[in-house]
Amino acid sequence: MFNRSNFGLNRIICPSYNIEDFFLLANELKLNYIELRNDLPGKGMTDSLSANEIKKLAKQNNLQICSINALQRFNNPEELRIIKDELIHLSEVAKAINCPAIILCPANSNSDFRSKKEQYQDTVIMLKELASIFTEYNIMGFIEPLGFKSRSLSSVITAMGAIREVGYEGYKIVFDTFHHAIGPDNLEKLRNEYDMNLTGIIHLSAVTVDLSTEEYKDEHRNIDFINDKLKSKKQLEYFANNDYNGIISFEPFARDLQELNKGELKNRINMAIKNLIPIE
């Protein structure tokens, strides 16, 4: 069974906050984990604070920085040198701030004309190529399948197969409730094929708009789990019933949530946790 100690915040929930205020928000909510990002305009991963300043902030607020989001297009061998250089940079930052993992996002483009077989083979090739960097920095790689139609890796089962083929223990999977709902897997398939031990983190959000699944976009992701069409609570129930006791990080992109004042945002997050615990 999950409790508040399992939950964390991805910085996308309040991208306008400076990093000190983001840490403070998580602390005031009595959460244990935060995820940083490298894609927030004008912010950088650490808002130009030094590694020592970031570590001090984390300690003061009783927080673990659990990941940096993300190394993009990690499974595109045509960009091998660029991807390796970016991973080295991310790994240097992660190691300096005591962050144990980097999220790996697959190529997601309508101009990707590789076959599914080629995309899988390239995923394996790149995971093998990048493993030495993760080993050197003692950082883990969390692979995040994306459910969008333009994605090159959409299934946690496929990601699991790639990890096993590579044979490197430093890789785990990001289970994202949004991408699971719009992707090819279902809970029955997970029950039969998925290895729960390969889950590194769960990304959690909800969708309430009246659209078809194919029309869902990141901007629709909120934390209203009462009216959630993703059925994220049911997805979490599956993990709870299979002894997952790891990190669950809120990752909503909805602008109306991001623009709430601090008091309203805290109320929404507390309400979301209340609606999810206990998971019945």
Where is each model-derived feature located?
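Glycine-rich, proline-tolerant flexible connector loops at the mouths of alpha/beta enzymes
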Residues: 35-58, 107-112
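Short hydrophobic interaction/assembly module
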Residues: 51-80
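A short acidic, helix-capping loop that chelates divalent metal ions and anchors anionic groups
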Residues: 40-42, 73-78, 110-115, 183, ...
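Histidine-acidic metal/acid-base catalytic patches
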Residues: 1-8, 16, 20-30, 55, ...
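Residue-level recognition of alpha-helix initiation/capping sites
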Residues: 16-17, 48-49, 84-85, 125, ...
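Active-site-proximal loop/turn and secondary-structure-junction residues that shape catalytic pockets
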Residues: 13-15, 38-40, 71-74, 106-110, ...
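Conserved beta-strand positions in the central sheet of alpha/beta enzyme cores
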Residues: 35, 67, 103, 142, ...
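Active-site acidic/histidine proton-transfer and metal-coordination neighborhood
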Residues: 20-23, 60, 76-172, 268
